[in-house]
């Protein structure tokens, strides 16, 4: 029998062993040995915990030039992301991509609503003239979702300031034919052109008013600050904002047909920060040409291309000028592409291989599809992705489009794949986002690559996203790293270890041997 070692030498002995426990990511994702893997097929091994989870930074790259405070992204699906979802995704540190299964004008209006929701200096405030009627002002309040319109002499943005119309000025005015010059607040408190954002916020605190109008030396309106935005800055410290305008970041999706060029012009005019080229198979001449056109026409606009599942697909899009990649083909909960088209790839393997290639060129990648819980998010990030796109996880939330309905006593919302027949027939086939996404514009018989269904009410993302955020912090803590950057660096160096899971191991890792139980995700 071998002699028992001195316990004081345990660390030295562990270091002397020929290999670390578990597998490196390269060994785990060897397709020749294990085939294609997805998130349930492996675990990340625990490391040393020497810090509180609250110290974990989840800051990450969305594209070459856009950084987010969280890796959470909402999918451009017509049952997931419209303006309300995009607003709160940005407030909570992520970003939302508004779907394009609607008219270009409607999509641009949704982008505009996000950009106007929270601003630092509002450099293009909506203004009215003294001869605007009270009824028109009320209609504008309903249309734009806010009140507080500066009144200028000529009704133009840089005109001489005459006053401001707020809710309290018009709320109880019954005669809608009255002119705003008769009810507006005259001589409002103003700030001088050139003051800083912090100085403007201090003035707002002192005057206890809702808006601060910024004017030049001649009394002409220059910009505006909002008190509600000051409050939001306190409530949402992680909010994703433009470094220049301080507006919330907003993304949107377009297709790759010629009509999408005019759609994109409207979106850029509305303030779009980043565009996703929405295609189930991104390695197409249509997408390559669209990337080149966008780079020539809107050189400052960030482009996320895809979807891709292989290095070869990624190489074409990177060479064309993509600023980010979207990974996934057939792995979404409502997607049947792999079943119908016999084309796709298990998501874990797709994420690892594409990220390993793209990261060498500084191109951030987004894992899209197959994510069902916090553990899956952690694994996608460990495999190299910078962000994680969620569709099914956010469907059924308060902020997702659609009305709730009841079935068998449960409160539900509709959720459908963009490759479903329902989505393809939402508008005319020409210009429809779904037919464009699946190259089906000219088909007389539509072949579905998705299904329509319903999901249970999940409540508001104002509670759900913080749950994901805290859970991901705890996950990084268990693995032993204080940031996503450190996690990924140590995965690549081989210090972070993995374990392949058999089917029995997967059963063991879930709830088992209970007569009944309740699974509550958060309080």
UniProtKB/Swiss-Prot annotation:
SUPFAM superfamilies, A to Z: CBS-domain pair, Inosine monophosphate dehydrogenase (IMPDH)
The protein, known as: Inosine-5'-monophosphate dehydrogenase 3
Binding of IMP, residues: 333, 368-370, 391-392, 415-419, 449
Regulation: Mycophenolic acid (MPA) is a non-competitive inhibitor that prevents formation of the closed enzyme conformation by binding to the same site as the amobile flap. In contrast, mizoribine monophosphate (MZP) is a competitive inhibitor that induces the closed conformation. MPA is a potent inhibitor of mammalian IMPDHs but a poor inhibitor of the bacterial enzymes. MZP is a more potent inhibitor of bacterial IMPDH.
Protein's UniProt keywords contain Transit peptide: no
Binding site for NAD(+): 278-280, 328-330
CDD domains: CBS_pair_IMPDH, IMPDH
Pathway: Purine metabolism; XMP biosynthesis via de novo pathway; XMP from IMP: step 1/1
GO CC, alphabetical: cytoplasm; plasma membrane
Main location: cytoplasm
Organism: Saccharomyces cerevisiae (strain ATCC 204508 / S288c)
Subunit structure: Homotetramer. Seems to be able to form heterotetramers composed from more than 1 of the 3 IMPDH gene products (IMD2-4).
Stored PANTHER family: INOSINE-5'-MONOPHOSPHATE DEHYDROGENASE, INOSINE-5-MONOPHOSPHATE DEHYDROGENASE RELATED
GO biological process per UniProt: GMP biosynthetic process; GTP biosynthetic process
Lineage: superkingdom: Eukaryota
PROSITE patterns the UniProt entry points to: CBS, IMP_DH_GMP_RED
Enzyme class, spelled out: oxidoreductase
